[in-house]
Structure formats: C-alpha cells, structure tokens
Amino acid sequence: MQAALMAFFMLLFSLLSLLGIAANGFIVLVLGREWLRYGRLLPLDMILISLGASRXCLQLVGTVHNFYYSARKVEYSGGLGRQFFHLHWHFLNSATFWFCSWLSVLFCVKIANITHPTFLWLKWRFPGWVPWLLLGSVLISFIITLLFFWVNYPVYQELLIRKFSGNMTYKWNTRIETYYFPSLKLVIWSIPFSVFLVSIMLLINSLRRHTQRMQHNGHSLQDPSTQAHTRALKSLISFLFLYALSFLSLIIDATKFISMQNDFYWPWQIAVYLCISVHPFILIFSNLKLRSMFWQVLLLARGFWVA
C-alpha cells in the first residue's frame, strides 16, 4: 500500500478512535453524574454506563497498542508488553460483548410484544437481574483473562527470567495463537453473540409486525407513532449490523490472517473498532436523556467558541 494511502487510513482510525472515546466518555460522565446525584440508576442506565466504560477503555487500549506496535514492531513483538496488552484487551473485549448482549435482551423484554408465558416472566424478572448480570459478566471476563494468562504463562515466565531466546518466544506465541486461541476465542465470543442475536431478532421481528399492523389499520408513514417505530427499527438494524461486523472482524483477526505487516492492516482495524466508535452515537441520539444533554453541551461549546 502506498505511504499516502496508509497515512490516510491511520488518520481515519485515529479520528474514529477519538470520536469513540469521546462518545463513550460522554455517556459515562452523564450517567455517572446522575448516579452521584440520585444514588441509583435505572437498569438501562446501568448497562449503558458499564458499556460506555468498557468500550472507551477498549478503544484507548487498542489505539495505544496499534500505534506503539507500528512504531516499535521488533521490540514489541517479542516483549512482555505485548502479552500484558492482550490480557487487558481480552478482559475489556469480553466484558463489552456481554454488556452488548444484556442491552439487547433488556431492549427485547421492554419493547417486544410477545405473549408467551416464559417471555412475560422474563419481562418481569430481568430488570432486577441487571446488576448481578453485569457483575457476573465482569467475573466471567476476569476468568477468561486468567485462562489466557494460564495458556501464555510459559511465555511470561521465560520473558521475566530471560531464558527464552527471542526466536523461541516467537515460536511459542505463533503456536498457541495459530492452533489454540482462535478456537477458544470463537467459543468465548459465540455465547454472548448468540444471546444478542436471538434477542435482537425477536425484537426486530416484533417491531416489524407491529409497524405493519399500524399501517394496515390506516396509520400513515407520517404518523408520529409509526415514525417512532420506524426509527427504532433502523436503530436496531444498525446495532445488529455493527455488532455482527465486530464479531466477524474479531474472529478473522484471531486467526492472524491480517498481520501488522499486511497492507490492509489499518483498514482492517477500522472495521474491528467500528462498532465501539459508531454505536455510542446511535445510543446517544436514541436516548432522550443523553440526547438532550448532548445538545446542551454542543450549545455551550458553540457559545464558548463564538465568545
């Protein structure tokens, strides 16, 4: 890839990362302020603040890793820093996947019009489970991180006491990253993705049928209620697309199909981090509380800039 084109993709990745960190940070600050003021949060806000915190940290860790690795490839590839980065990245990525899944389940039980007794029972019970599910997600992510640490323990040990040669460390990393990690990551990420997929498809189907029923009963496309359901459908479909893109990108990334030396590395990193950078804006504009605060901040910034 030409140097100018690579610089363009690096700049695009940087801008996307800054926007993602800013949007996720905004969600955390707004909801954190409300938490401090009232001493509690609604189940939806609990998930949003957890998701915003994990996504922002994940985006920050990924950005630092990509630019540090591109600047010091040889030293970083065989050093201890790379191993510790992966531990942080696996923890944050796993937590983010689970938080997204619980967000889709909460949307489903709150909005979907399904009369099955099991669904009605879940609709009643799920909001009360949210704090424990979030805590459980953090615990699961920590256990998964320990699992990766255990698999990589010989590398950490030998890097610390300097018995491995750089070549032997590289061979060990290549072996476990080629044969062990891809299958392990596929299993770990497929569980929350399956939960997400089932709940989001149930919700999309319910909203689609409800919108068609409203149009059949004489509601026009310009009717406020119809427009609200149409906007909700578009938001959910966008969420589904971004989450699926993130899942597929991470699975392919786990196979090391596209390495740092590959010409398409930076475009690929844009695809990997697209969901955690773009979806926060969808959440902000679809949430009345976050949207109103966002416009207030923009007006304040505009007034400060003009002054």
UniProtKB/Swiss-Prot annotation:
Q: What does this protein do?
A: Receptor that may play a role in the perception of bitterness and is gustducin-linked. May play a role in sensing the chemical composition of the gastrointestinal content. The activity of this receptor may stimulate alpha gustducin, mediate PLC-beta-2 activation and lead to the gating of TRPM5.
Organism, scientific name: Gorilla gorilla gorilla
Q: Where are the transmembrane segments?
A: 8-28, 41-61, 89-109, 130-150, 184-204, 235-255, 265-285
Q: Which GO terms describe its cellular component?
A: membrane; plasma membrane
Keyword field contains Transmembrane helix: yes
Q: Which Pfam families match?
A: TAS2R
Stated membrane topology is: Multi-pass membrane protein
- Which residue ranges does the entry give as Extracellular-facing topology? 1-7, 62-88, 151-183, 256-264
Q: What is the predominant subcellular site recorded for this chain?
A: membrane
This one is known as: Taste receptor type 2 member 41
Q: What is the lineage of its organism?
A: Eukaryota, Metazoa, Chordata, Craniata, Vertebrata
Q: Could you cite one Gene Ontology molecular function of this protein?
A: bitter taste receptor activity
This protein's UniProt keywords = G-protein coupled receptor, Glycoprotein, Membrane, Receptor, Sensory transduction, Taste, Transducer, Transmembrane, Transmembrane helix
Cysteine-cysteine disulfides: none
Q: Which residues are glycosylated?
A: N167
Which InterPro entries does the record associate with it? TAS2R
Show which residues sit on the Cytoplasmic side of the membrane: 29-40, 110-129, 205-234, 286-307
Q: Extra info from the record?
A: Most taste cells may be activated by a limited number of bitter compounds; individual taste cells can discriminate among bitter stimuli.
Q: Is Flavoprotein one of the keywords UniProt gives this record?
A: no
Give the record's family classification: Belongs to the G-protein coupled receptor T2R family.
Q: Where in the cell is it found?
A: Membrane
